[in-house]
């Protein structure tokens, strides 16, 4: 249900017009995407992911069978909170509101560390903490989900919790010498030594700081938050983005030295449109102009290098070798980025690219038997044994 992004695609298409009025392609895509979200994606989660206790299952198989004893992740549950909150804010369906409120209560009661601050990484179905490590990634999704719940419902507890997590991340998650946010910590916020690729800072963690702070600023017009949001946006443009390659670097040490040269097409296009959204929310014209130029640049590069002849965005390139499978989230981010590029430029080629990817999704990634989407496709064939609900799959 991380397909909440599809809701954003639909919103973009609904709220934007070409120079000659709404196109047939716009109307068709918007209708098809909203229908898929409401008739296939959300019902799967409503029917199969809701546990009889106060929470949500940590793993659900393709056919809707829950793994009842599976651990439950903080990121998954923050995404569930965002998803039903956003669904209610978009469609005003009381069934979505009920699950948004349920997920808000469960998340606050189960995943917020009342002693040390922050968000637990993993609990068991009874709510006992299995992994109390603190990850910037989980913190940002918690802020994101709680802020969306506030926007959807006006629930002040959600805003208070989101603001509290923001302060915790600023106080304990920032790296003091070179600034930015460290990837992960112990339960009591001591910096760890063992990181993937030896990277204490990652593009992905900062991407979701940018995303979360953008949404929080829509709820809470705080000067300190504004400064940190602008810092994150400029950090992406000035330090994380490699203009010579037209891609974002992914892994860094504390001093912001890039450690691995690889390109993640999904993260690239996601960063482009999120930068535009941040600049728009900040109402900073100079930043907006920079973000728009960068978004077009990186979207163009990814479409040239990563869009396969079958119509999907490939996964990544490392050491000159492109990994050619289609991931669920990469396709959605590509559609969003193409619609964003179309909005910026007015060039219908970008809208056509979005439709090309959507056509691939309809043909290869939507599960017509059980609902929802497959997680991955290889050579145009879906991988059918991957759970539809898991720690990383929402």
How should each PLM-predicted stretch be described?
Residues 1-5:
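Bacterial N-terminal signal peptides that target proteins for export
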Residues 8-10:
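Eukaryotic, compositionally biased intrinsically disordered regions
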Residues 12-15:
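C-terminal motif of bacterial Sec signal peptides marking the signal peptidase cleavage site
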Residues 19-394:
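Glycan-recognition and catalytic cores of secretory/periplasmic carbohydrate-active enzymes
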């Amino acid at each position: 249900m991380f397909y909440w992004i599809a809701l954003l695609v639909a919103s973009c298409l609904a709220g934007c017009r070409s120079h000659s009025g709404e196109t047939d392609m716009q109307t068709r895509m918007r209708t098809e995407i909203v229908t898929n979200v409401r008739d296939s994606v959300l019902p799967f989660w409503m029917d199969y992911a809701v546990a009889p206790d106060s929470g949500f299952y940590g793993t659900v198989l393709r056919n809707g069978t829950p793994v009842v004893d599976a651990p439950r992740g903080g990121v998954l549950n923050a995404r569930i909170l965002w998803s039903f909150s956003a669904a209610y804010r978009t469609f005003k369906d009381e069934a979505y509101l009920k699950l948004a409120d349920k997920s808000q209560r469960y998340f606050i009661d189960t995943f917020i560390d009342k002693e040390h601050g922050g968000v637990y990484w993993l609990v068991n179905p009874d709510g006992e903490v299995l992994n109390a490590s603190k990850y910037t990634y989980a913190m940002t999704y918690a802020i994101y989900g709680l802020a969306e719940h506030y926007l959807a419902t006006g629930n002040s507890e959600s805003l208070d919790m989101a603001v509290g997590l923001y302060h915790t991340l600023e106080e304990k998650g920032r790296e003091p010498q070179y600034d930015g946010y460290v990837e992960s910590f112990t339960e009591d916020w001591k910096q760890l030594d063992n990181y993937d690729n030896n990277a204490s800072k990652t593009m992905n963690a900062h991407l979701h700081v940018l995303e979360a702070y953008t949404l929080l600023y829509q709820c809470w017009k705080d000067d300190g938050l504004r400064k940190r949001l602008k810092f994150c946006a400029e950090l992406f443009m000035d330090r994380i983005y490699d203009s010579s390659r037209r891609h974002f670097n992914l892994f860094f040490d504390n001093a912001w030295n890039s450690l691995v040269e690889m390109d993640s097409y999904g993260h690239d296009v996601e960063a482009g449109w999120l930068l535009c959204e941040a600049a728009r929310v900040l109402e900073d014209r100079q930043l907006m102009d920079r973000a728009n130029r960068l978004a077009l640049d990186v979207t163009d590069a990814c479409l040239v290098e990563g869009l396969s002849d079958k119509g999907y965005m490939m996964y990544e390139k490392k050491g000159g070798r492109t990994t050619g499978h289609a991931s669920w989230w990469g396709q959605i981010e590509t559609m969003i980025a193409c619609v964003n590029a179309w909005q910026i430029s007015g060039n219908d080629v970008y809208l056509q690219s979005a439709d090309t990817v959507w056509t691939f999704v309809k043909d290869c990634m939507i599960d017509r038997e059980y609902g929802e989407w497959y997680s991955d496709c290889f050579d145009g064939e879906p991988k059918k044994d991957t759970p539809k609900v898991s720690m990383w799959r929402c």
